[in-house]
C-alpha cells in the first residue's frame, strides 16, 4: 500500500504554496502540478500521475485550446474565477504547472479529493 493509499484525501504533494495560505485554510497562491491528457472522451479529474494531478480535457493541443480547457477545469475545481488561474509552466507539454490565486491548500486538497472520489 502506497502512502497515497493510506491518506487518499491528502493531495498536498501535487502543489506548492507560493504565498499566503501557510496555515492551510486561508487563501493564497498555489501552484498545482498537472498531467494533461488532451482530446479525451470524458474530460475531468482522473487521479494521480506521479506527483501530479492527472486531468483529461476534450480540447486538442492546438492553438492553446487544451491550455484554455485546463484553466477552465482547474478554476471550476478550485472554486475561483478563470482569471485567477494561469498555466505558468509547460505550455507545450502534458506536464504543466498551474498557478491558482485565492485558494487555500486545505480547500484545494479537499476539492481534488472530492472530484477524484466522485468520478465514475
Predicted feature descriptions by range:
Residues 1-72, 77-80, 86-120:
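Contiguous, often N-terminal, cationic amphipathic patches that form binding interfaces
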Amino acid at each position: 500500500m502506497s502512502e497515497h493509499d493510506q491518506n487518499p484525501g491528502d493531495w498536498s504533494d501535487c502543489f506548492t504554496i507560493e504565498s499566503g495560505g501557510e496555515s492551510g485554510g486561508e487563501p493564497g497562491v498555489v501552484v498545482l502540478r498537472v498531467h494533461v491528457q488532451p482530446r479525451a472522451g470524458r474530460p475531468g479529474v482522473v487521479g494521480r500521475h506521479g506527483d501530479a494531478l492527472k486531468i483529461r480535457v476534450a480540447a486538442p493541443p492546438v492553438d492553446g485550446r487544451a491550455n484554455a480547457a485546463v484553466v477552465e477545469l482547474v478554476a471550476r475545481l478550485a472554486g475561483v474565477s478563470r482569471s485567477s488561474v494561469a498555466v505558468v509552466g509547460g505550455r507545450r507539454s502534458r506536464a504543466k504547472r498551474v498557478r491558482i490565486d485565492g485558494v487555500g491548500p486545505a480547500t484545494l486538497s479537499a476539492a481534488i479529493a472530492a472530484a477524484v472520489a466522485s468520478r465514475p
